[in-house]
Amino acid sequence: MTNSQSDAALAAVPDRFDPSAGGPGAYDTPLGITNPPIDELLDRVSSKYALVIYAAKRARQINDYYNQLGEGILEYVGPLVEPGLQEKPLSIALREIHGDLLEHTEGE
């Protein structure tokens, strides 16, 4: 078998780890910063800076909620969406904002 024939034979074999092929090596839809889309999140606030503050405050509350669970104190509200396995508080906060699950007044 020549070099060009072996290259052609390899090209005919599908790559089972190619994410675009949709097989077992495919990636799940990303969550957090890329999903929900930033443009849709910006529709819910006045500026990208307001979005950063809003999401950071809520992520801090979610993080504090998880930290207080072991102490038996329930001062903070937990996630309002079903968190994924090892999903970060910021990703949860962005999904809550996207789902209009929070009330927000800018400047507070």
Curated annotation (Swiss-Prot):
Reaction(s) catalysed by this chain's protein: RNA(n) + a ribonucleoside 5'-triphosphate = RNA(n+1) + diphosphate
Keyword terms of this UniProt record: DNA-directed RNA polymerase, Nucleotidyltransferase, Transcription, Transferase
Lineage: superkingdom: Bacteria
Region (Disordered): 1-32
Entry-linked Gene3D superfamilies: 3.90.940.10
EC number: 2.7.7.6
Pfam families referenced in this protein's UniProt entry, alphabetically: RNA_pol_Rpb6
Disulphide-bridged cysteine pairs: none
BP GO annotations: DNA-templated transcription
GO MF entry, a single one: DNA binding
InterPro entries (UniProt xref): DNA-dir_RNA_pol_omega, Pol_omega/Rpo6/RPB6, RPB6/omega-like_sf
GO CC term (a single one): DNA-directed RNA polymerase complex
Function: Promotes RNA polymerase assembly. Latches the N- and C-terminal regions of the beta' subunit thereby facilitating its interaction with the beta and alpha subunits.
Family statement drawn from the similarity comment of this UniProt entry: Belongs to the RNA polymerase subunit omega family.
Self-association and partners: The RNAP catalytic core consists of 2 alpha, 1 beta, 1 beta' and 1 omega subunit. When a sigma factor is associated with the core the holoenzyme is formed, which can initiate transcription.
Protein name, as recorded: DNA-directed RNA polymerase subunit omega
Annotated source species: Mycobacterium avium (strain 104)
